[in-house]
Amino acid sequence: MRTKWGPTWTRRVLLLGIFWVSAYLPVRGVSLPPRLPRATGNSTQCAVSPASEFPEGFFTKQESTDGGIVIYFLIILYMCMAISIVCDKYFLPSLEIISDSLGLSQDVAGATFMAAGSSAPELVTAFLGVFITKGDIGISTILGSAIYNLLGICAACGLLSNMVSTLSCWPLFRDCAVYAVSVGAVFGIIFDNRIYWYEGAGLLLIYGLYVLLLCFDTTISRHVMKTCSPCCPCLARAMEERIEQQTLLGWEDESQLFIRRQSRTDSGIFQEDSGYSQLSLSLHGLSQVSEDPPSVFSMPEADLRRIFWVLSLPIITLLALTTPDCRRKFWKNYFVITFFMSALWISAFTYILVWMVTVTGETLGIPDTVMGLTLLAAGTSIPDTVTSVLVARKGKGDMAISNIVGSNVFDMLCLGLPWFIKTAFTNASAPIEVNSKGLTYITISLNISILFLFLAVHFNGWKLDRKLGVVCLVLYLGLATLSVLYEIGIIGNNRIRGCGV
């Protein structure tokens, strides 16, 4: 089957530029970011510099100030391009085949495999905190990307998508409800500033129940929509639309529905907009037309595309030598390897990106708390942003939104795994000590962001478009600004100074 994943090179440049600009906007804004632990002693607090968790930069501070910082900027842009290529050519095609093989709907695929793959950097960061850096793997790591993922990435999907996607009520309601439960669970666990092994296991159990819910999503959604439709009009409309589609097309699999309702040419060819497959109508029914995509080493014809192709050739070669291209017929059966290898490369490129961003922030003299809420947060969320925007541009709004919320659920609940390992095996004699100062404010911020997202989608007519993108951007900037003011002590009583200052 042929795959046409990815935007054109011109659009890719635009995406990378916007992602780079977004790195300087206040993001996440709920607590200290990953790799920014708080050291407590008596009644004072201090923030350990995020640079302490990374190797030294290539240049001295003076050399960086004299022009070496330009190299850091170029590496950051190059890593953004590398992440985009991995997601475009390997990660999303493997996800498509996995979803098709398991018969998953768009929203379920987005909330499970897509969320897990794009959130791999956060999980790797947590394990590094357990086994290598010995840093705080508490509240800052769990809640770091919440507001940005919920509102910031949704804004990016709406503003950068070239088509309007119709959203379903049930997937958003399901994921937001589970996320609210996750927030409550974490609130209860870290309220006493200590984490025990059974509490980490409890988070894993909740995530297991969430996966079980997704496995029976079709049956559960029908029951919920039938029961709640009298009091919830949006659920009633969702049920009517699903019944109409199944009655009209005679297919119950949503992935097949998506293929059939995309477009129909005069020659009788059904073709999915994403280019995943071509279906031709014959006397024997639908027959599949297979064709491998062009080689990644084929030079584009346009001059601008050639320039970017040459620049990205080292990354293209590295990926071609290490990761099977499951879009091609020969490697199609190796899609599981493609999925895990692409997630591994996403984690590696994200680590380098965040490392360079940290060194850049140190060179520019940005305070640690502000840098954690801006540069580091945006860097670690680049994979989620790229994957969500790419699928939104293909018209798969449910998959994009489910990935946005599902990534938060994955980050929060699956961090019970490193907690469980640390308390049950690595250091079984003592619980994990975490800092829950400001927990009430954080919980309120998360619940407000969940409510804002659901209401924004509802009042926008359940459409993912530029209007929704603007609304989410305004809401996000407002909450993020308040969070930055809270962290630097302008509002509240939570001023954090740098350790050693």
Swiss-Prot record:
Q: Which NCBIfam families match?
A: calcium/sodium antiporter
**Disulfide linkage:** none
Q: Where are the transmembrane segments?
A: 67-87, 112-132, 137-157, 171-191, 195-215, 306-326, 335-355, 363-383, 401-421, 439-459, 471-491
Q: How does it sit in the membrane?
A: Multi-pass membrane protein
Topological domain spans for side Extracellular: 30-66, 133-136, 192-194, 327-334, 384-400, 460-470
Question: Which keywords label this protein?
Answer: Antiport, Calcium, Calcium transport, Golgi apparatus, Ion transport, Membrane, Potassium, Potassium transport, Sensory transduction, Signal, Sodium, Sodium transport, Symport, Transmembrane, Transmembrane helix, Transport
Q: Name one GO cellular component term.
A: melanosome
Q: What is the lineage of its organism?
A: Eukaryota, Metazoa, Chordata, Craniata, Vertebrata
Q: In which tissues is it expressed?
A: Highly expressed in melanin-producing cells such as skin and eye compared to other tissues. Strongly overexpressed in melanoma cell lines. Expressed in dental tissues.
**InterPro entries the record matches:** K/Na/Ca-exchanger (IPR004481), NaCa_Exmemb (IPR004837), NCX_ion-bd_dom_sf (IPR044880)
Catalysis performed (reactions)? Ca(2+)(out) + K(+)(out) + 4 Na(+)(in) = Ca(2+)(in) + K(+)(in) + 4 Na(+)(out)
Which GO BP terms, alphabetically?
calcium ion import; melanin biosynthetic process; monoatomic ion transmembrane transport; negative regulation of melanin biosynthetic process
Protein name (record):
Sodium/potassium/calcium exchanger 5
Q: Which family does it belong to?
A: Belongs to the Ca(2+):cation antiporter (CaCA) (TC 2.A.19) family. SLC24A subfamily.
Give the function comment from the record. Calcium, potassium:sodium antiporter that transports 1 Ca(2+) and 1 K(+) to the melanosome in exchange for 4 cytoplasmic Na(+). Involved in pigmentation, possibly by participating in ion transport in melanosomes. Predominant sodium-calcium exchanger in melanocytes.
Record the organism.
Answer: Mus musculus (Mouse)
Which coarse location class applies to the principal site listed for this UniProt protein? Golgi
PANTHER family to which the protein is assigned, alphabetical = SODIUM/POTASSIUM/CALCIUM EXCHANGER (PTHR10846), SODIUM_POTASSIUM_CALCIUM EXCHANGER 5 (PTHR10846:SF61)
- State its location(s): Golgi apparatus, trans-Golgi network membrane; Melanosome
Q: List the stretches on the Cytoplasmic face of the membrane.
A: 88-111, 158-170, 216-305, 356-362, 422-438, 492-501
| Source organism superkingdom | Eukaryota
Q: Which GO terms describe its molecular function?
A: calcium ion transmembrane transporter activity; calcium, potassium:sodium antiporter activity; symporter activity
Write the signal peptide boundaries.
1-29
